[in-house]
Amino acid sequence: MAIDPIQLNPELAKWLETRQNALKIVKTTTTPSGQTIDWVPIESQHPGGEVATPPPAELAVADQSQDPQQPVSPVTFELDDPKVERGPAGTVPILRPDISRLTRRVSLDEFLTKQGGAIVNKARRNAQPTDPDPAGYFHNSDSQDGTFYGWDGILSVWDPKINTPDGDGSDHSILQVWLQNYDKPHLQSVEGGWTVDESLNGDDKPHIFTYYTVNGYTQDDDNKGGYNRVHDGWKQHSGSVFPGIRVGPSSVFGGTQRDISMKFKLHKQESGKVNWWVAVQGIWMGYYPANLFDGGLGDHVDWIGVGGEVYSSMGIPEHTKDQMGSGHRAADGWRKAAFMRNLRNQVNMNATMVNNDGTATSNVATPGGADPYTIQMHMISGGAWGSYFYVGGQAR
C-alpha cells in the first residue's frame, strides 16, 4: 500500500528505510490480500552463511487428535496456492511491515512495543521495581510453573472486533502462548499465536505472529526483542509460512470451526548449537538462536502461559468493547467460544510431551476493575482434546 509521507511519522519512515536497506532482497512480491513480501537468500540471515538444521519433520506436528462430535477444519495460507508468486529457489519470505495506516500520532516506540507479557504472570519470582507496568491489558490464561523445553497446542481462529467503541487504532486481540524464563534479572520470553492488530498488520484480520524479548520488554531492537522479523533475531526457514502471514478462513459462530497448530521446541543440533524452533501446521517456520538469551531461556523455560490477551487504548480500558476470541464468554462453549486444545509441554530435551496441567489466571487493565473476559479450564480431560479450555468475551 502506498505511504502518504505527509500523514506518516517521519521517524517511522526512516526506520523502515533503514530496515529495508539491511536486507539482501532479491525479489519482492505481493500476496492476493496485499501483503508485501521481500525474498532474501536463506544464508544471508546467518553470520558466515551457516544455516541451522531444523529438528526432524515428524517433531513439527502437534497432537492432532479430534473428537468426531466436534469436527474442526484447518486454516489455510495464501502461499499454499501454487499460483501465488514466490521468490527464486534458495530464498525465504520476509514480511515487509505495513505502516501505511499509521499517522503522525503513532511513534516508533508505540508501533514496535508489545509489553503485555510483562504482567501476564504477576507471581513470577524475578519481578523488579523497574519492570514495565503497561496499562490497558487484559489476560485470561492457563498458567503452569516448572522446567520445560517446549510446548505445542492447537488454537481456534476467529476475527475479533477491536478498537471499539473508540480505540485509537493500536488495540489488539490475541490467542497465544508465552514461554518465559526467570533466571536473569530481566524477564525473557518467546511467544507466538495469532493476533488481530491493525497497527502491526495493516488490516483487521488474524495473522500468525512470533515475539521475543531478552530484556523484560524494556526495549525492542535488533537481537533484543520484537515482533516477527520487524527486528533482527528471528531466522526464517520455511518458504511458505512466515511470521505475520494472514490466515483464514476464520471460525463461524454456530458453524464451521477453524484452528491452527503451533509448536515451540528447544532443539540441539549435532554441531552443539541450540535454537528455539517454531512450527506452524506441522511446518518448521524458523527459529530464534538460543544465544540471543545468554543462558536463561536458551537453556529452559520456567513458566508456560496459554490464553488470550486484549489491549485497549481507551483512557478507561474497562469501557472497551474489544473482543477476545470469538467475542463470546467461555461458558458458551463449543461453536460459540474460542478454544485452545491438545495443550502439551515438552519436559526434556528428548522431546517427551505431557499434557499441560495449569491453573486459570486472569488480570485486568486497572487494579480492581471489571474483567469482561473469562476462561473455562478442562485440564487432562481424558478426551480427544486432552488438556483444553474455552476463553473469550465481549459478545458480538
Predicted segments — roles?
Residues 1-396:
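Exposed, interaction-prone regions of secreted/extracellular proteins
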